[in-house]
A protein has these predicted regions:
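Flexible mid-to-C-terminal extensions adjoining Fe-S/redox cofactors in radical SAM and related proteins
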Residues: 1-7, 264-336
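Conserved alpha-helical substructure of the radical SAM core
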Residues: 1-112
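Residues immediately within or flanking Cys/His clusters that coordinate Zn2+
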Residues: 12, 16, 20, 241, ...
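Conserved, mostly hydrophobic/aromatic
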Residues: 19, 257, 279
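Cys/His/Pro-rich metal-binding microdomains
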Residues: 20, 24-27, 245, 302-305, ...
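Radical SAM enzyme [4Fe-4S]-AdoMet core and its adjacent flexible, acidic
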Residues: 34-35, 39, 108-113, 117-119, ...
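Buried hydrophobic side chains on well-structured beta-strands
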Residues: 62-64, 91, 116, 153, ...
């Protein structure tokens, strides 16, 4: 159905490729100085005006992402302009630059949601993200005292923090965190250079058990990310059955102007560029490969009994030639 109907519900804006950290797992390979300059706000606003011609603004969430969005000195101005046009907005942050005063300014600018990255206990987090643990925890403390804001903590599970997830869960609960989201690494950017970032099949199955058990206990609202179909764990580790919404309900505008599906999809799958194309034209008339995925039914997918539910998996796990880079369903099958 989404081949014909593709209601835009989330639009990611890559506001910067600059970052105050240099995380081992960064899929964008972000640094303090970026090769691509920040997209000026005045270049993005016409995109929002165009989006408003094809859907009601209040139905679309604008996710400002990076890099680290808070390195932009005009991030409050960006948020206010998004709000003034009737859109909701939020962002993902490492938390280091978030202060009480800045949070108030962001809320006054209409901020609706924040996700803070915390990747383990202090030693594990700092191994992955440099000496930033206390900055992340300070941000989380600020958010626990904030009303009328949707927020959660995001954790990248890897070899270093896998064995301490129970302790991390207890720490988050004690800190007042209500929502926790877990994801695992895929081979992109700096991440593909470090084998310690990847779980074994047995560890991945244990992770699914940990999430399912935690959800059943009701101690904290924990969910697994959208990293593909999970077989028997569907319905147990997140609130919905897997579906890749890239190009059907989710779009992105990258720092260089490229228009794509979700932020994690490889650059060669870009469908246009805001400096050459109208966003609405691209959204309505392109994205064929993301909306009609029958071309994915090849190689291991052609023989897979889960095809009817999985439909080729998440688009960001497809390589340069459309090949499957990783399949969590097959990983779980191999761990039985």
């Amino acid at each position: 159905m989404l081949e014909k109907e593709h209601p835009l519900r989330q639009l990611f804006w890559e506001v910067t490729l600059r970052c105050n950290l240099a995380c081992r797992h960064c899929g964008s390979d972000c640094r303090k100085e970026a090769a691509v300059p920040d997209m000026p706000l005045e270049h993005f606003l016409p995109v929002l005006d165009d989006v408003a011609t094809i859907t009601e603004p209040n139905k679309v969430m604008i996710n400002t992402v990076g890099g680290e969005p808070l390195v932009r000195e005009d991030i409050v101005e960006c948020g206010r302009a998004i709000t003034d046009r009737g859109f909701r907005w939020g962002f993902v942050t490492n938390g280091v630059l978030l202060t009480k005063d800045l949070l108030k300014q962001l809320l006054d600018a209409g901020l609706r949601s924040i996700a803070v990255s915390l990747d383990g206990l202090e030693e594990e987090h700092n191994w992955l993200r440099g000496n930033s643990y206390h900055g992340a925890m300070n941000a989380i403390t600020l958010l626990t005292k904030t009303k009328n804001l949707v927020w959660d903590v995001i954790t990248c599970v890897n070899q270093r923090n896998f064995s301490s997830l129970q302790l991390l869960k207890e720490q988050l609960i004690a800190a007042g965190v209500k929502k926790w989201r877990i994801f695992t690494i895929f081979p992109q950017g700096r991440a593909k250079l470090n084998p310690e970032l990847f779980l074994t099949p047995q560890q991945f199955r244990q992770l699914m058990e940990f999430i399912a058990t935690t959800r059943n206990n009701g101690e904290i609202n924990l969910s697994y990310s959208c990293e593909g179909f999970l077989g028997d764990y569907e319905g147990k580790v997140r609130n919905h059955i897997f579906r890749c919404d890239a190009g059907t309900m989710i779009a992105s505008v990258l720092a260089n102007g490229d228009i794509s599906g979700c932020m994690s999809i490889r650059s060669q799958y870009a469908q246009g560029n805001i400096y050459h194309d109208r966003f609405s034209d691209v959204w309505n008339n392109r994205f064929e490969k993301m909306r009609n995925r029958r071309w994915m039914k090849k190689d291991q997918c052609a023989r897979c009994k889960a095809w009817d539910w999985c439909a080729g998996g998440p688009f960001h796990l497809r390589g340069d030639n459309g090949e499957m880079l990783h399949c969590n369903y097959l990983t779980l099958c191999s761990a039985k």
